From Swiss-Prot:
HAMAP family: Ribosomal_bL36. GO terms for biological process: translation. Keywords: Ribonucleoprotein, Ribosomal protein. It comes from the Bacteria. It comes from Corynebacterium kroppenstedtii (strain DSM 44385 / JCM 11950 / CIP 105744 / CCUG 35717). InterPro entries: Ribosomal_bL36, Ribosomal_bL36_sp, Ribosomal_L36_bact. This is Large ribosomal subunit protein bL36. The lineage of its organism: Bacteria, Bacillati, Actinomycetota, Actinomycetes, Mycobacteriales. Belongs to the bacterial ribosomal protein bL36 family. GO terms for molecular function: structural constituent of ribosome.
Length: 40
């Protein structure tokens, strides 16, 4: 999992979901797990 300043480019990928967990924003992509990231 990468830690990224901005998730805008990742959330536009096909299969991406934006999820909030414990006050942090995550992008999960089951279709292409390379694009899994946390904002920070």
């Amino acid at each position: 999992m990468k830690v990224r300043k901005s998730l805008r480019s990742l959330k536009n990928k096909p299969g991406a979901q934006v999820v909030r967990r414990h006050g942090k924003v995550f992008v999960i992509n089951k279709k292409d797990p390379r694009f899994k990231a946390r904002q920070g």
